[in-house]
Regions:
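Noncatalytic, basic helical substrate-engagement surface that gates or grips nucleic-acid strands
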Residues: 2-135, 139-162, 166
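Conserved small/polar residues in nucleotide/adenosyl-binding loops
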Residues: 235-241
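Helix-hairpin-helix
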Residues: 190-210
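Generic structural signal for alpha-helix starts
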Residues: 85, 226-228, 240
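A short, charged helix-loop
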Residues: 162-189
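Short, solvent-exposed helix-loop connector elements
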Residues: 27-31, 188-196, 226-234
Length: 242
C-alpha cells in the first residue's frame, strides 16, 4: 500500500443491524419465507461504497463468537442487550459468503471486537499516510479520527457523512478527538452497559472535559468546586500513569 491508496474498513454488524431495522416495518421476505432485509441492505451499502468511492483496498470486520477481553474485564459488558434477532443470525453466514464472492477479506480476531480490529488497522494505515475510512454509524469511532483517518457514517436520510477531525470536534464540542474517550469515560455508554461516574451525564461530562482538558485533568483537580458530585464518586477511575 502507498499514500495514493484509499482504504475502507466496514463494521459488519453495525451495518447489518442498521440494514435489518431499516426494513423493520416492511421486511423483505422472499418466496421461501426468509427475511432478506439484512442481506439486501448490507449488499446495497457495499455496492454503493464500491461504485461511489472505488476504494483500492477494503475489508469487512466481524465480531467473533464468544466473549472478548472486555467481557473478561467487566462481566456486565453489553449484558443488557437482547439476543440477536433470528433473521440476522441466519443472514450472517450468507452475507459472509457474499463478501467472499466479492473477494473482499473478512477480518475477525478471537477475543477482539470488530472496532478493535478496525481501530488497529486504521491507526496503522493512517500513520503510513494512507487515506482510511471507517464505515460505521457508531459514534465511538470518533476517537480514532486523525489527519488521514475518517469516519464514513451512513445518514438516516440516505447517503453518507464523512467526518474528519474538525467535524468530530464540532459534533462533540471538544478541542481534540482524543477527548471523545474522556467524555465517554465520564458519562459511560448505555448502549454497551458501561457505567460512567455516578451523577455525571453528557452535559456535565462535556463541561468537565472543556474545563480540565481530559479525564486525567479531572482526576488531578478533584478538589475543584466545579467537580460534582463529591470526589469519592471518582475513586473507581483507573487511569494510566507515566
Amino acid at each position: 500500500m502507498n499514500s495514493d491508496d484509499k482504504l475502507f474498513l466496514l463494521d459488519a454488524y453495525a451495518l447489518i443491524y442498521r440494514a435489518y431495522y431499516a426494513f423493520i416495518k416492511s421486511p423483505r421476505i422472499n418466496s421461501k419465507g426468509f427475511n432478506t432485509s439484512a442481506i439486501l441492505g448490507f449488499v446495497n451499502t457495499l455496492e454503493e461504497v464500491l461504485k461511489k468511492e472505488n476504494p483500492t483496498h477494503i475489508g469487512v470486520a466481524f465480531d467473533p463468537a464468544g466473549p472478548t477481553f472486555r467481557h473478561e474485564a467487566y462481566e456486565q459488558y453489553k449484558a443488557q442487550r437482547e439476543e440477536t434477532p433470528e433473521a440476522i443470525r441466519l443472514s450472517v453466514p450468507i452475507i459472509k459468503d457474499i463478501i467472499r464472492a466479492y473477494r473482499i477479506p473478512i477480518l475477525e480476531v478471537a477475543g477482539y471486537e470488530a472496532d478493535d480490529v478496525i481501530g488497529t488497522l486504521a491507526t496503522e494505515a493512517g500513520q503510513q499516510g494512507i487515506t482510511t475510512y471507517m464505515m460505521t454509524p457508531d459514534k465511538d469511532y470518533g476517537q480514532l479520527v486523525s489527519e488521514n483517518v475518517f469516519m464514513y457514517r451512513p445518514k438516516h436520510t440516505g447517503g453518507f457523512e464523512v467526518m474528519g477531525i474538525e467535524q468530530v470536534k464540532a459534533k462533540f464540542d471538544i478541542q481534540s478527538t482524543q477527548q471523545v474517550i474522556d467524555m465517554l469515560g465520564l458519562m459511560g455508554d448505555a448502549s454497551d452497559n458501561i457505567p460512567g461516574v455516578p451523577g455525571i451525564g453528557e452535559k456535565t461530562a462535556l463541561a468537565l472535559v472543556q474545563k480540565f482538558g481530559s479525564l486525567q485533568g479531572v482526576y488531578e483537580h478533584l478538589d475543584d468546586k466545579a467537580i460534582k458530585p463529591k470526589p469519592v464518586s471518582y475513586t473507581h477511575l483507573t487511569l494510566p500513569t507515566n
